[in-house]
């Protein structure tokens, strides 16, 4: 009994003592480490040549371990070194983002991005020319940006990532986007872009000039596995749906556009497009890499716009054709495309347009050769001169060296394959020949190139250098004006105003004339230059290389630049000639001369 009493007393003392200690002498336990729901990985950043461009910290959240996230600030820093984006938390789940050129807000509860000028917020073009806004420019040294008019000036943009199941995240210091998602938001008309292949981030500081051969084989190689993880397959499909619904340029001719792509979104449009669309949807969602790649190819059939959009990731992603992966993948892709065609017989009409254009181009080249000779770029008959101009591309490296003072000015002797050189040579010959009155620029077999060259030509022919386009996301119409080095002496000065040609200009076009070969006739016709031939082939959108979530690249017509004429009309249907010609008359110089001289006499 005594022992029990003593034990009871002891227990009471312990209990009372414990109560007293909890107030007067608290016991401090060991620190409990913060439990993070992600891991971070510092990964190398390279350019397309594999040269080091630094490192960047990526996050991988536990619920999506295969999908890389990046802070907005870190992403800005690799895209525009020396700059960043600051994030300020303004309320629970609400953040204000400030970049060097603009602002935006993010709601991480609703997964919502908003901005009154999202192009300013993502503007990287200051790296190309100081003070330049986010507009289309290939940065050939023969022209330079002058001004940009936007109508209206600002439009509020709301991008609802949550609608597509894309999760935006944050901590106290920054906002985090899936890497591919923010890369899609930033890619611009110069093709500044970034992609992540699971090991390395690739950036393109020189835009399209560093991606002339597409995505490098070394960058693509780590992606070439037979399967994809479930979280990557799910996210990649959601991200593709968001991008092609919101950022597609909607030229107006694709099968999915005609099936309500813009109104329904990509996912629903595929579900509603019969067996062909449903098959494509399942392939794109597949964890089998071969099936997925096949799905990007069949999607390309549904978005075929004549030559700008290629969602088939094998088009610009270099894959070694001697590898077992390529052999197996190509067998699956070929079989799936054949199956798709049985579900989508209307695709035959789309493919026929491409085939007919190619056949016409071959026919016209043969007729030109028969009349003027093989490879002849300048041909004169009586008072009329023809200049064969087969591409809106030039040897940009040669011209860049000249403008930097590192090399001689390109000439027909040193750069015989440069179409810009050929044009200038032809103009000088015609201008200095007293017999020549009419100058016909033949772009009847020209499939496109750089809009910078288009601006150069409109400046010489019409003293105008205005690039007209609309943003299909915001509805804004743009007029981007350029200074042009009209005498190509390497300087932008008053001597450029002295350049003048006393010639009756005309343009020869056909359905093969596509993209820039469609833009030039659209502008020249509005400026009063006669067009001869057949209706041009269309192609109204600027083209972007875009990263897929897996790390592949694809290309598509972008919302950032759907080309318009001076009336504000989409030019994708093609441009009707002033005088229609049968193919037998394209190089009937006598008939062409009569039409051109009649036009100018009655003008």
Residue positions per predicted region:
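Linear, non-domain "peripheral" regions
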Residues: 40-57, 64, 83-85, 141-161, ...
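C-terminal "post-core" interaction segments
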Residues: 207-227, 234-237, 241, 393, ...
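Extended intrinsically disordered, low-complexity coil regions enriched in Ser, Thr, Gly, Ala
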Residues: 79-111, 191-197
């Amino acid at each position: 009994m005594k022992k029990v009493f003593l034990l009871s007393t002891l227990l009471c003392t312990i209990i009372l003592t414990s109560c007293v200690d909890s107030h007067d002498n608290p016991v401090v336990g060991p620190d409990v480490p913060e439990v993070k729901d992600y891991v971070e990985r510092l990964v190398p950043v390279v350019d397309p040549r594999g040269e080091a461009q630094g490192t960047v910290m990526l996050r991988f959240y536990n619920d999506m371990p295969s999908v890389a996230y990046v802070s907005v600030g870190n992403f800005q820093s690799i895209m525009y070194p020396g700059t960043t984006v600051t994030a300020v938390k303004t309320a629970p789940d609400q953040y204000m983002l400030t970049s060097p050129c603009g602002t935006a807000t993010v709601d991480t509860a609703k997964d919502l991005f908003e901005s009154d000028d999202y192009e300013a917020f993502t503007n990287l073009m200051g790296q190309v020319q100081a003070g330049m806004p986010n507009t289309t420019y290939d940065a050939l040294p023969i022209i330079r940006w002058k001004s940009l008019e936007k109508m209206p000036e600002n439009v509020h943009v709301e991008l609802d990532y949550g609608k597509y199941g894309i999760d935006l995240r944050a901590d106290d210091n920054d906002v985090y986007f899936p890497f591919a998602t923010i890369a899609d938001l930033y890619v611009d008309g110069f093709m500044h872009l970034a992609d992540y292949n699971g090991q390395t981030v690739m950036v393109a500081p020189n835009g399209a000039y560093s991606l002339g051969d597409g995505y490098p084989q070394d960058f693509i190689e780590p992606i070439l596995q037979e399967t994809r993880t479930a979280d990557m397959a799910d996210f990649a499909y959601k991200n593709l749906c968001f991008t092609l619904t919101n950022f597609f340029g909607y030229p107006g001719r694709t099968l999915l556009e005609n099936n309500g792509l813009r109104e329904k979104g990509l996912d629903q449009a595929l579900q509603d497009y019969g067996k062909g669309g449903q098959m494509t949807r399942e392939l794109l969602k597949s964890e089998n890499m071969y099936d997925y790649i096949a799905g990007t190819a069949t999607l390309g059939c549904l978005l075929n716009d004549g030559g700008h959009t290629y969602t088939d990731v094998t088009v610009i992603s270099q894959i070694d054709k001697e590898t077992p992966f390529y052999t197996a993948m190509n067998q699956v892709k070929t079989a799936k495309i054949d199956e798709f065609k049985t579900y989508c017989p209307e695709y035959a009409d789309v493919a026929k347009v491409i085939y007919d254009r190619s056949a016409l181009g071959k026919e016209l080249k043969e007729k030109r050769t028969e009349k003027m000779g093989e490879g002849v770029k300048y041909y004169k008959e009586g008072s009329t001169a023809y200049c064969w101009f087969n591409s809106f591309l030039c040897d940009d490296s040669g011209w860049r060296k000249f403008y930097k003072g590192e090399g001689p000015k390109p000439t027909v002797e040193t750069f015989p394959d440069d179409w810009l050189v050929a044009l200038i040579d032809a103009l000088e010959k015609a201008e200095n020949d007293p017999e020549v009155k009419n100058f016909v620029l033949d772009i009847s077999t020209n499939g496109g190139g750089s809009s910078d060259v288009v601006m150069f030509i409109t400046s010489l022919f019409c003293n105008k250098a205005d690039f007209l386009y609309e943003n299909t996301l915001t509805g804004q119409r743009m007029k981007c004006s350029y200074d042009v080095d009209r005498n190509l002496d390497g300087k932008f000065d008053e001597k450029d105003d002295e350049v003048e040609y006393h010639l009756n200009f005309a343009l020869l076009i056909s359905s093969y004339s596509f993209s820039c070969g469609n833009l030039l006739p659209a502008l020249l016709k509005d400026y009063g230059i006669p067009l001869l031939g057949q209706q041009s082939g269309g192609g109204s959108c600027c083209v972007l290389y875009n990263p897929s979530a897996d790390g592949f690249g694809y290309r598509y017509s972008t919302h950032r630049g759907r080309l318009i004429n001076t009336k504000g009309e989409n030019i994708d249907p093609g441009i009707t000639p002033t005088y229609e010609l049968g193919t037998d008359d394209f190089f009937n110089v006598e008939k062409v001369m009569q039409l051109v001289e009649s036009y100018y006499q009655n003008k």
